[in-house]
Amino acid sequence: MATGKIVQVIGAVVDVEFPQDAVPRVYDALEVQNGNEKLVLEVQQQLGGGIVRTIAMGSSDGLRRGLDVKDLEHPIEVPVGKATLGRIMNVLGEPVDMKGEIGEEERWAIHRAAPSYEELSNSQELLETGIKVIDLMCPFAKGGKVGLFGGAGVGKTVNMMELIRNIAIEHSGYSVFAGVGERTREGNDFYHEMTDSNVIDKVSLVYGQMNEPPGNRLRVALTGLTMAEKFRDEGRDVLLFVDNIYRYTLAGTEVSALLGRMPSAVGYQPTLAEEMGVLQERITSTKTGSITSVQAVYVPADDLTDPSPATTFAHLDATVVLSRQIASLGIYPAVDPLDSTSRQLDPLVVGQEHYDTARGVQSILQRYQELKDIIAILGMDELSEEDKLVVARARKIQRFLSQPFFVAEVFTGSPGKYVSLKDTIRGFKGIMEGEYDHLPEQAFYMVGSIDEAVEKAKKL
């Protein structure tokens, strides 16, 4: 095992000099004793003359020139397999939940090649989430990739928590949650939410929070992905949740600047598309098992054309766009039914009835959107009878797209609801065909199935 010495420390970037005949490879892990702590560095560049430039995976406070650094001669390796379920780990796969050692049987390197073309498989099977607006407007494919797009505070994390809860309870699958650069408080809430729902023993949690150095936040997504790949290669259908993919890009920007690369548009790293591709190409389904991934994507200043969300769009099968405008109406989940898309919304995949219902709902909401200006200027009375009916139905549909969540019972005060796809289609079809024209629109707000709306109307 070769040993080198630190020659320069600039924040999270540490330069280490090794003997010329024992220079570590790019992505190799190095270890340095920093006081009582062991710090892991990852090689990013070979500068020549035996010097390598590395990124610290933890705080570089207290490092000084001349300290001895060991080359571990392999990339960062993390525990994989069933031993990781129910545990909280950091980027290096070390437990941070005070429950002792992981006791894993196997460790895998976090840098791995994506599956080859022959190994890939294509599935048309739908994954029911129990969330009406998602199942109807932007259905998820088993083994597909989904992005939850939204600005600050419109409900990305809450939606993600609800998805994990529903899928873990209703589908009893394994999940891996990678918290990339999010708030520590959210990670804590998340852990307790999973424990309260009794699904913690089916989830592996990997956290690299906002206060961690950029190298840590850049690699934590790969740590989570490696654990998911192991479950997939055992022949399971696994779910990978990444919250938040934007912070992964942001960490890449910070690392890129520290390594002295020239920034590109809006200050992002020049390797943005490649870094995103390296991660996304590994999140895929093979003939052995599937990885279905749900990724929260923070949209800076609500601008979907920003390079980071725009690069992410290219990799996704379904996009769930959360809208501040809908959230401000008090309709949660604040999914925009006109902006959200899915490759699965195709009559050959979902069936003609589902397709027609979804498109019908969209056209009614679109017409309502167009009529809003007329209503604002001239009032409802100036509309034709036909348009008045469209507006009434659109307002009912809009309210019926809301739903009480299990993980948000504390906020809404009403018990969470899981709605099957069959009930969802039946409800929206009924509203469009005028079966419920006699019910007041308040009856449709924050209910599960259409039968609950009918019951609620009796009490109003």
Swiss-Prot record:
User: Which Gene3D superfamilies does the UniProt entry name for this protein?
Assistant: 2.40.10.170, Bovine Mitochondrial F1-atpase, Atp Synthase Beta Chain, Chain D, domain 3, P-loop containing nucleotide triphosphate hydrolases
Q: Which GO terms describe its cellular component?
A: plasma membrane; proton-transporting ATP synthase complex
Please give the chief subcellular localization of this protein: membrane
Extract the Pfam families matched here: ATP-synt_ab, ATP-synt_ab_N, ATP-synt_VA_C
In terms of InterPro entries, this protein maps to: AAA+_ATPase, ATP-synt_VA_C, ATP_synth_F1_bsu, ATPase_a/bsu_AS, ATPase_alpha/beta_chains, ATPase_F1/V1/A1_a/bsu_N, ATPase_F1/V1/A1_a/bsu_N_sf, ATPase_F1/V1/A1_a/bsu_nucl-bd
Question: What Enzyme Commission number(s) does the record list for this chain?
Answer: 7.1.2.2
The superkingdom of the source organism is Bacteria
- Family in the record: Belongs to the ATPase alpha/beta chains family.
Q: What is this protein called?
A: ATP synthase subunit beta
Point out the gene that encodes the protein: atpD
